[in-house]
């Protein structure tokens, strides 16, 4: 009970706190005199400077061990991701809705495509060489200027009807929209053994939806990524490299219904069956064209 | 303990759920991490609560025998009819009748009484029967003659009275409710844990709010800022510590139980360690609780007998003829007998039928002479007169075992002065000599000396009845005493005492050197109390009381300078007249105090007095009436063998062997657990910074999140649990029994130094080490450290599936997520590796690890092994389960933080070295925790 009587009043506590902040008898602030504070701060400054120095040293050593051209490990990029343009995300993944009769609903989509293809204009590709080979373009030496390697040209006109040059509306106006499919870059990745990787778009089977098979027109023809764009040697070796693209023009999309389109990349070393990653080797999107 | 700490955890859990609520409202696909975290926190609190309850219930079960009270009956006059009703049905105003032998059923004011005497010892400690009548004699109800009290006994006579108080309102009921009323005080360890919670909560909340403000200033969304705030607070809560502390305490409790200290209340384990005053009972605790022959006087010489527990080593000179006679008297003039069938039991442990002194004499002679029963058979007893309080002697006449000697032997023992009166000769060296004045003087000196030792002295004499007057056929009559009972031959004196337990003096010395004051509180006579106090060292050999000084200098007690005396013997009568201030002065000024003839209530007063000195008080007791003092004490210690159920119920700890030295073992364990808890907490707090930094860096510099909250839980509740328990097995660094008890307000469990050193030194080093592993993983996968800064928004975006790294490779959202988990695993492993170093450095606070020995505490290695195994299991075993956010980490990343771990060890060895080299220096003051 003796302990219970020691409850301090609020003012006492405040007084004690004030005394702690500044104790006039000993000249202590917050429990230390000024000189003590200087000493302890000096110690901490020194300690932290040394620790930061050591950490910086460790990072420096780490950076020295890193190869500038090829990452040490690529085990987490076994198979490339696939992306779609235009890319409009809804609650669950890509959702592209537009109304043919309302220009405003699809101009933003075509705008996305146009600005994406700006990187594939002949002017942007001026530093790249023309390739015609149907095999991998291996380069062991740094033959290009500035100790780099050559990259192959990919220009928007290779996408023909979906290049935006002949049809500025990319087919959106007539309900046969173009979608551009891009495969992610992975350093020194070889997608297949001999045949070039190919894009294949289908309607995703939905119950209670009897659909005629999807008809697609691919650009470049057959929807292939030519093998001479591979392997990719990294940003430092190929500063001007641009990903090859495939455009898919969907010809028979039913109007006023939401359909799910799945575009896979068919190649020996590209997998699309990872249950966790919806964008590995494939891209899936919902499409609803209204009239 | 459960209060403060689990509230912190509950707050954490609720915050998590709130965070999820907020996230869910803004984005219904929010991850369930916060829900898991909150649930786990809640489960942790509940589990540890159940665990602590189970631990205590286990101890409490032993108390199950309590509350079995025999229903008490009372004779009451109602409706002019005598009725017998249960005592609890009595009401105020009932007229009850009491007769000798009854227990008083309530507090009663007597209306009439015939020779009524009551035994008030359970209430006041007065062992003399008190007479009661109907007269009002004193203002104080305890003093007046016309009130009898509930639970006391009427010894003789009859009385009629009116009930004035029943149940809880009776005097003893008030004592009992006092006992339950004082039970709510917090134990010192609970106060320390609360203090620790304040520190942790303070750090968590202030860092959280600081970064909330920073986040808002950096134009983060307010909802995000709130989620950061919650994450920071949760990262700071040491989830596993509550369980660890409980386990550590129960481990110690188990260890103490092995050493005969049964701990009922887990927190009491530590309380004993901070004890600064022990108020010890005498009988049974300090002493063996059995009369034993201590001294003999014959041939004008005092001999010392062995009073140790086994009593076998009686090394005094037994060649004298006087001893032969004396031993015969001791063996023959004794009515006590061993219970049959105990031949295999050691003599001192055999059960005896007979009173305490006769038992002592029987065992004494059995040890020295061998089979006493056989001796008695050979010396056939003809007649005997048992001891009674008027005669004050005991006498028997025997045929002798010598077949040629037809004389009868008369043997007698009794109060020495009465025996001496009956003697005219004295035996010296086997020869009878006349008892002259000088011999009588020698007898008195010896008698006084033995009496002054607080011992009970008996005189022995014998007489061979002349064969002519008392032929073999003589018929002795004990009623008429037709034989001589004077002019006998005095043989010797023998004194007995309840001797101290042999381990006690050592234990008291240990207490002394440990800075614990031992106060004896006993109902016994002051002289006996003082003698025992001296022999066990409670009053040390060279210290004197005021009375001793007065006697030595031959001056009046009042003239003695009180400052000269180190010791004090205070009786209950003196204590009654003292004001609290005087008692405080007494307790403060005398290092050695004995309270004699004290009542149970006075025991409470003494305990309160000690607590006013800011002391942590341990009290030992066994009676019902001790229970308030036991409750009031910071730690009540009840006796396991002699203790009453009420005392055991009120106590926090039970000495299974009633032995004082067990308390000292308890103190040692208590101090050790305090030190080890300090180490455990330091160990646990350290990683909090390493767990907190990722969030801060994430908020300020926008790195991909280095470690997730679920992963944090696996450190707090996975890898760190066994190691922190292992620290409870650590041996003491130095002799912990050679330092003062900790001051309960100054020596905190978690002090500023501990927090600062753990957070700002080792914790920071750990954070840097863990970040190094994290950066290594990212850099080797393609993201250099510099590119990670301010990458957060792009990194966390689900809609960006071609994020470029430094090599121009493009990552999908899930690929990044997986890399992030690899980062979590790497950061986790970094912390784990450095926690091994942290565990090793925490083994000592001052000594070098090498002095303490790396391998003495095997459990530490079990802890380290468990850490590594759990981490390996998480990474390689569960790496494929994505919900746990672990991935299979490459082998070399496990070693990236090793240099940092070594650095931590080296730094801490340096700290300890400087502390040892420059004690009291600036370094010592700031770095020793």
Curated annotation (Swiss-Prot), chain A:
- Record-linked Gene3D superfamilies: 1.20.5.170, Na, k-atpase alpha subunit
Extract the PROSITE patterns matched here. ATPASE_NA_K_BETA_1 (PS00390), ATPASE_NA_K_BETA_2 (PS00391)
Stated consequence of mutating residue 58 to S: Has no effect on pump ATPase activity
**Residues carrying sugar:** 99, 103, 130, 146, 161, 193, 222
Q: Which domain of life is it from?
A: Eukaryota
The record lists the effect of residue 263 to S as: Impairs the assembly of an active pump and its targeting to the plasma membrane
The cross-references to InterPro entries, in alphabetical order and at most eight, read:
Na/K_ATPase_sub_beta, Na/K_ATPase_sub_beta_sf
Identify this protein by name.
Answer: Potassium-transporting ATPase subunit beta
């Amino acid at each position: 009970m003796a302990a219970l009587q020691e409850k301090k009043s609020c003012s006492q506590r405040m007084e004690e706190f004030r005394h702690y902040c500044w104790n006039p008898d000993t000249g202590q602030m917050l429990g230390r005199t000024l000189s003590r504070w200087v000493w302890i701060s000096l110690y901490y400054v020194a300690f932290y400077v040394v620790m930061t120095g050591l950490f910086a040293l460790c990072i420096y050593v780490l950076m020295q061990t890193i190869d500038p051209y090829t990452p040490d490990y690529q085990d987490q990029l076994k198979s490339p991701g696939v992306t779609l343009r235009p890319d409009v995300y809804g609650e669950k993944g890509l959702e592209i809705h537009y109304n043919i009769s309302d220009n405003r609903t699809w101009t933003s989509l075509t705008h996305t495509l146009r600005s994406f293809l700006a990187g594939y204009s002949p002017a942007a590709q001026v530093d790249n060489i023309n390739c015609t080979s149907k095999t991998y373009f291996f380069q062991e030496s740094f033959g290009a200027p500035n100790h780099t390697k050559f990259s192959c040209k990919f220009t928007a006109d290779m996408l023909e009807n979906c290049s935006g040059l002949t049809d500025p509306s990319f087919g959106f106006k007539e309900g046969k929209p173009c979608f551009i499919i891009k495969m992610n870059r992975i350093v020194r990745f070889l997608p297949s053994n001999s045949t070039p990787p190919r894009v294949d778009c289908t309607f995703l089977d939905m119950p209670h939806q009897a659909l005629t098979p999807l008809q697609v027109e691919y650009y470049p023809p057959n929807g292939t990524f030519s093998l001479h764009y591979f392997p990719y040697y990294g940003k430092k070796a190929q500063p001007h490299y641009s990903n090859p693209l495939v455009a898919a023009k969907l010809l028979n999309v039913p109007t006023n219904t939401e359909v799910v389109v799945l575009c896979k990349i068919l190649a020996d070393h590209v997998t699309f069956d990872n249950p966790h990653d919806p964008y590995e080797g494939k891209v899936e999107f919902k499409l609803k064209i209204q009239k | 303990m459960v209060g403060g700490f689990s509230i912190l955890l509950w707050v954490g859990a609720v915050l998590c759920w709130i965070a999820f609520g907020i996230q869910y409202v803004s984005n219904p696909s929010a991850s369930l991490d916060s829900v898991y975290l909150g649930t786990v926190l809640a489960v942790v609190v509940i589990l540890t609560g159940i665990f602590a309850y189970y631990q205590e219930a286990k101890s409490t079960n032993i108390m199950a025998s309590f509350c079995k009270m025999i229903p008490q009956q009372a004779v009451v006059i109602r409706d002019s009819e005598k009725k017998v009703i249960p005592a609890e049905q009595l009401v105020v105003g009932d007229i009850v009748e009491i007769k000798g032998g009854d227990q008083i059923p309530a507090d009663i004011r007597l209306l009439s009484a015939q020779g009524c005497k009551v035994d008030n010892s359970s209430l006041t400690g007065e062992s003399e029967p008190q007479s009661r009548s109907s007269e009002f004699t004193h203002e104080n109800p305890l003093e007046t003659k016309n009130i009898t009290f509930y639970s006391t006994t009427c010894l003789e006579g009859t009385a009629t009275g009116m009930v004035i108080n029943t149940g809880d309102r009776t005097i003893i009921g008030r004592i009992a409710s006092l006992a339950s009323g004082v039970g709510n005080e917090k134990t010192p360890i609970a106060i320390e844990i609360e203090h620790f919670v304040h520190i942790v909560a303070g750090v968590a909340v202030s860092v959280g709010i600081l970064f909330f403000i920073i986040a808002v200033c950096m134009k983060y969304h307010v909802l995000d800022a709130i989620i950061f705030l919650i994450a920071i607070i949760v990262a700071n809560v040491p989830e596993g510590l509550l369980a660890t502390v409980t386990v550590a305490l129960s481990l110690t409790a188990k260890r103490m139980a092995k050493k005969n200290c049964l701990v009922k209340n887990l927190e009491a384990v530590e309380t004993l360690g901070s004890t600064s005053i022990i108020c010890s009972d005498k009988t049974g605790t300090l002493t063996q609780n059995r009369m034993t022959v201590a001294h003999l006087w014959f041939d004008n010489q005092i001999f010392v007998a062995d009073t140790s527990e086994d009593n076998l080593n009686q090394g005094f000179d037994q060649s004298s003829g006087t001893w032969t006679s004396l031993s015969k008297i001791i063996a023959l003039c004794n009515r006590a007998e061993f219970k049959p069938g105990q031949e295999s039991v050691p003599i001192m442990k055999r059960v005896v039928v007979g009173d305490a002194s006769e038992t002592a004499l029987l065992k004494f002679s059995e040890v020295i002479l061998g089979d006493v029963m056989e001796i008695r058979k050979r010396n056939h007893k003809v007649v005997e007169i048992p001891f009674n309080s008027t005669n004050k002697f005991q006498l028997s006449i025997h045929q002798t075992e010598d077949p040629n000697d037809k004389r009868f032997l008369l043997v007698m023992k009794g109060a020495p002065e009465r025996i001496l009166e009956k003697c005219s000769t004295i035996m010296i060296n086997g020869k009878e000599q006349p008892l002259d004045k000088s011999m009588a003087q020698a007898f008195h000196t010896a008698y006084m000396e033995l009496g002054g030792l607080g011992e009970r002295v008996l005189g022995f004499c014998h007489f061979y009845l002349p064969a002519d007057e008392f032929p073999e056929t003589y018929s002795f009559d004990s009623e008429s005493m037709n034989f001589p009972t004077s002019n006998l031959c005095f043989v010797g004196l023998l004194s007995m005492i309840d001797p101290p337990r042999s381990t006690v003096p050592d234990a008291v010395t240990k207490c002394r050197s440990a800075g614990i004051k031992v106060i004896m509180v006993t109902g016994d006579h002051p002289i006996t109390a003082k003698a025992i106090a001296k022999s066990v060292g409670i009053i040390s050999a060279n210290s004197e009381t005021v009375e001793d000084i007065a006697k030595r200098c031959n001056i009046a007690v009042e003239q003695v300078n009180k400052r000269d005396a180190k010791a004090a013997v205070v009786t209950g009568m003196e204590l009654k007249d003292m004001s609290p201030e005087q008692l405080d002065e007494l307790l403060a000024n005398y290092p050695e105090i004995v309270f004699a003839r004290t009542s149970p209530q006075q025991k409470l007063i003494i305990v309160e007095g000690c607590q006013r000195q800011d002391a942590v008080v341990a009290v030992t007791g066994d009676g019902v009436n001790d229970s308030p003092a036991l409750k009031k004490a910071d730690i009540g210690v009840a006796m396991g063998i002699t203790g009453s159920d009420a005392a055991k119920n009120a106590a926090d700890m039970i000495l299974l062997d009633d032995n004082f030295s067990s308390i000292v073992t308890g103190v040692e364990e208590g101090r050790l657990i305090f030190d080890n808890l300090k180490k455990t907490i330091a160990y646990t707090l350290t990683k909090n910074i390493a767990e907190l930094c990722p969030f801060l860096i994430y908020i300020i510099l926008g790195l991909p999140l280095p470690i997730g909250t679920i992963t944090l839980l696996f450190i707090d509740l996975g890898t760190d649990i066994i190691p922190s328990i292992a620290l409870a097995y650590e041996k003491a660094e130095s002799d912990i029994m050679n330092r003062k008890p900790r001051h309960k307000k100054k020596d905190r469990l978690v002090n500023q130094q501990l927090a600062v050193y753990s957070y700002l030194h080792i914790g920071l080093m750990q954070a840097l080490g863990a970040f190094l592993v994290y950066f290594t993983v990212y850099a080797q996968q393609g993201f250099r450290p510099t590119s990670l800064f301010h990458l957060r928004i792009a990194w966390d975006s689900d809609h960006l599936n071609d994020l470029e790294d430094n090599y121009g490779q493009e990552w999908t959202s899930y690929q990044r997520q997986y890399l992030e988990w690899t980062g979590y695993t790497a950061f986790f492993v970094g912390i784990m590796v450095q926690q091994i170093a942290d565990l090793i450095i925490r083994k000592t606070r001052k000594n070098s690890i090498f002095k303490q020995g790396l391998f003495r505490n095997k459990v530490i290695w079990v802890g380290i092994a468990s850490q590594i195994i759990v981490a390996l299991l998480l990474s390689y075993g569960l790496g494929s389960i994505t919900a746990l956010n672990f991935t299979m980490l490459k082998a070399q990343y496990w070693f990236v933080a090793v240099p940092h771990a070594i650095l931590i060890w080296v730094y801490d060895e340096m700290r300890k070295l400087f502390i040892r080299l420059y004690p009291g220096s600036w370094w010592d003051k700031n770095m020793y925790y």
